[in-house]
A protein has these predicted regions:
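Divalent metal-binding pocket/active-site signature
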Residues: 85
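Short beta-strand scaffold segments in enzyme catalytic cores
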Residues: 91-96
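Nucleotide/phosphate-binding catalytic cleft detector across ATP-hydrolyzing
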Residues: 1-82, 99-215
Length: 215
């Protein structure tokens, strides 16, 4: 992505404001182009003011996508307790309190990572690919099926475990699933989760609006 791409986007669409969030190093020319062409521009980092409280002890180490998805969920369901499950390279579990804001979360290996590690860290288990919408049996009848079922169903059971733990504490909450591998999770959970593929983008837009209006 280059400054020329920025110029082209601004020429094609009526863009007025912009926000950038990335884990990779961003070209200074891209930042300069966005800053020059935008009425309001934010290079999102841990110092950016947020519309919800962030109670994480080390905000500088918190993934920008995680806090953005938390803001996105709070935007869609204000004044609610929220569990956000983001299934990508890793699976993250984040909790937003209706009263206290973002309280933290956990990080676990993603579906693809689990499949790969089973192959790489053992001598005989094969590399297995699983379609996102594939229905896996409860118990596999061959090794490939056992790996697929163990990983995909295990991910679903993991999510259910978090949901059950919150419910057992008497916490009413709304659960969101997001991320590129969310369909794997949704297949295992079936009910009780709201699928929102654009949760991070919704959160980034809210953060941009919040800062535009004098956070």
């Amino acid at each position: 992505f280059t400054s020329a791409d920025v110029e082209r986007l601004f020429s094609l669409y009526p863009i007025k404001n912009s926000i950038v969030s990335t884990v990779a190093n961003i070209d200074a020319a891209v930042v300069n182009a966005l800053n020059r062409l935008s009425q309001h521009f934010i290079l999102f980092d841990y110092l950016t003011p947020l519309p919800i409280a962030n109670c994480y002890e080390t905000p500088e180490t918190l993934g920008q996508d995680r806090i953005a998805s938390a803001v996105g969920a709070a935007t869609l369901c204000p004044d609610k307790n929220l569990l956000i499950v983001d299934a990508g390279s890793a699976i993250t579990y984040d909790f937003v309190s209706a009263e206290q804001g973002y309280l933290g979360g956990n990080i676990a290996p993603g579906i693809k990572m689990r499949l790969t590690v089973l192959h790489q860290m053992t001598k005989k288990l094969p590399q297995v690919e699983v379609e996102q919408n594939a229905l896996t049996p409860l118990f596999g009848k061959n090794t490939k099926e056992a790996i697929a079922a163990g990983v995909v169903r295990g991910g679903g059971f993991e999510v259910k475990g978090y949901m059950r733990a919150l419910s057992e504490q008497g916490i009413d909450f709304v659960a969101f699933a997001t991320g590129g591998h969310a369909p794997y999770i949704l297949n295992g959970v079936k009910d009780g989760m709201r699928h929102e593929p654009n949760l991070v983008l919704i959160g980034l837009n809210k953060i941009l609006e919040y800062n535009m209006h004098g956070a």
